[in-house]
Amino acid sequence: MAAKFLRRALVACAATLAVSGLVAAPASADLQKPSQQWLRDSQAGLFLHWGMRTSPGYTSCSAWEKAITDGGWDPAYWVTEAEKLHASYLVLASFHSRLGYSRAWPSKIPGSCSTKRDFLGELVAAAKARGLKVILYMTNDAQWHDEGGHEWLDSAGYSKYKGKTVNLDSQDGFGQFSYDNFFEVMKNYPDLGGFWIDNDNAYWESHDLYQQIYQQRPDYLLSNNNEDTPIMDTISNEQKTGMTPSYDYPQATYTAMPRLTEACFKLPDTGSWWYGGSNSAVNKMLNIGRFITNSGSSIKSLMAETAMVNGKFPSNQEAFNNFAKTYLDAIWESLGGTEGAGYMYGGMQPGFWNDGAHGVITIKGGNQYVHVLTKPSTSTLKIRDNGYRVRRVTNLRTGAAISFSQGGGSLTLSGLSGWDSYDTVFKVETAGRTGTYDPATVTLKASASASGHGGQSASDGSYLTYFDNNKTLPVNLDYDLGAAKKVQYLGLNQREDSVSYARSDTEQSARIKAYKVFVSSDGKDWGSAVKSGTLPSHRGVQFVDLSAVTARYVRLQVTSTYAASSDSSRYKRLRIDETWVGSDYATAAG
C-alpha cells in the first residue's frame, strides 16, 4: 500500500470514528494525527543526555552554567551534528534523574537546578531555523535524588512555593513538582516538538496530564520509554540487545504498524548514556546496521551521543558523525521518504535470505531498495518477491545493471561482487503486483476468534484490523474463493506485536510455528493435509507454498505458535493483519 494512500485511509478512518463518537481526543494509538506527520516522515533523531553530572560533574548549578558558557556552548553545533546523522529532531535530556534533575532553562519553580541562560530556548530556535524539531525529556523518578551523596532536590524551596509541605524525594511529591514543570514549559516554548517521557508517574495519571498537554499544545508529540501507552504518540524501545544479527534492532520491538515506533540506542554501545570522561569507540557496522534495519521496519532511530559540558562530542563520536553523513548521503534515495517493505506498505520479503545473507527492504512508490547488510556466501541473492514483477535492478551507488531472474516466487540476483563493507543497496524497479486474489472476493472464516477480530478481519485489505485467535489452538482459517480456482501459495502478514525471538521467559514470539494446509471442493470434506510444515519466527511477510492445486476452499490450520507457557500474555496467541491466496508466481516484467 502506498504511503499516501495509507495516510488518506488513516485520516478518513479517524474522521469517521470521531463523527460516530467512538473516539475521544486524542485519537486512539493506531490512528494517525496530523501532528505526527513530521515524525512519520523522519528516519532518525539525536538523543542528548547532558546535565550537572556530566563529567567532571557539578553540585553547584551556577558553576555548571558558567562552565557551559565559558566552554563556548553553541546550539548550532548540536543541530549540525544531528544533520550529519540525517536526524530530523533532537531530544534534550537534562532534567534526568541521573544527571542532577538539572533544568537547562530558566524556571520560576524551585525544586532543582535551573539555569539563568535559556539553553533549551536557544536550541529550539537554532533547530527551527534549520527545519528540525526539539523534544524535551521529562523524568518521572525521584529515586536518584541523593545520588553521589548529594541531595539534588530542594523540597523546602518547592514546599514554600506551593504553600504546603511536599517531599520531592517521594514519587508523589516529585510527581507534583514535575507536573508543574510540564505546564511552565508548555507556556514558554510553543515551538517545542513535545515531551519524551521516561515512564509514567501516578500523580500525572491521576491529574490527566497527557490529556491536558494535548489540549494546550495539540501540536506536541508524546513518547513513552519502553511502554506502549495508548494515549502517547510514540513508543520508544531502549537499548535492545541479544538479536542475531546484533544490528537487527526491530527483532526486539513489539508494536504493530502504523503505531509510531522509535528505537533509542547508544552510539558508543558501552558505557553510560552521558559523558563520563572517556572517548568511547563507535562501532560503524553495528550502528549503520541499526539505522538501516530500523528504517526497514519504519522505526525511527534515536541515536544517543555523550555531549561534554561545553556541548562538544568526543572525537570518536564526531568522526562517526562525519562518516555517517558521507555514507548516508550516498544511499539516501533508499531511505528518505521510504517505508519499511514486507509489512503494511507492501514490498518483498525482508530478513533472512539465502546462504547467510541478511538485510531489509525499503519501499517508495514502484521502487524497492534491497539493503544487504550481511552478504551471502555466494554470488547470488534470492528474495521472495511477494508477487511483484521486476523490470530492472541496479546497484544504487554505481548505477550498474544487475543480472536477475524471477520464478518460483523469488527474485534472484546473480553475478554479484564488490560488496560494500556495511550496506550494499540494490534498487529494484517494479511493474506492479500480480498472481493474488483480491481480498474482496475471498471469504475468510476462523474456527475461533476474539470479539471484534474475526477471520474476515485478516482478509479485508486493511492493516488497521486483524484476526485474533482468542488464544485457541489449533485454529483453522478457511478461505472460500467463491469457485474452484488455482491455488499456488498462501501469504500472510502476522501482526508485529511481539518480539521475533525469545528475549526472556516472559517476552517471546507469538508467531505461527507448525501448520497444516487442507483443500476441499465443498468446505466439508477436507481429506488429508496437502502440506504441513513450520514457519520461522521472523518479522515480515511469510509464505506457505503448495504444489499447485485447484480448489474452492483452502484451510490453514495452525497447530502451534512459538511463545512458551511462561509468557502468559502471548502463549497460544495468534494475530494476523492480512492473509491472501496466491494463484501464480510472478515473472519478470522484461
Where are these regions (language model features)?
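Predominantly extracellular/luminal regions of secreted and cell-surface proteins
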Residues: 324, 435-460
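Extracellular/luminal ectodomains and secreted, surface-exposed scaffolds of diverse proteins
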Residues: 359-361, 398-409
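Aromatic, loop-rich ligand-recognition surfaces of beta-strand-rich domains
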Residues: 361-366, 374-387, 430-437, 459-529, ...
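Solvent-exposed beta-hairpin/edge-strand motifs
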Residues: 384-399
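Surface-exposed loop/edge segments in extracytoplasmic proteins
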Residues: 397-404, 524-531
